[in-house]
Amino acid sequence: MPANYQQLAVVRRLVHDLNIPLKVVGVSTARERDGLAMSSRNRRLSLKQRALAPCLYRTLLAARQSIAYGERTAAAIKEGAAQVLQSVPEIKLEYFELVDPDTIRPVDVVNAPVRAALAAWIGKTRLIDNLYCEPRRCPVSKER
């Protein structure tokens, strides 16, 4: 959620519902070289915690890859992605969801683009991140 996609979705909905003549434009999440979403909260991390933090992005990438390779069941996608975090007990996952980009409601089946979104605690610092994920559309091969 561009560092906070949820806020972007709420503002877009507000502008739409109130018929405000504005175009709300989201931008990509700014990331450090190791994939960690840039945030003022990152300053609160110790050096050891900071070294663990890119695992959050790798978790989101695992979900994206699972979706790209054809997995459509949200539970299976989330379970696979959560395995990335299991190797890092210092990270306490608060939530990991696949949500509809417009409504921010969790989905059970991925048949359209979604946002993989998570929040986790590393020590006393809460970090959030999200990533756009799109199901791959593979052409049907013609058998002869």
Feature map (PLM): residue ranges:
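Nucleotidyltransferase catalytic core that binds NTPs
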Residues: 1-90, 99, 103, 131
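Phosphate/ribose-recognition catalytic cores of enzymes acting on nucleotide-derived substrates
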Residues: 80-144
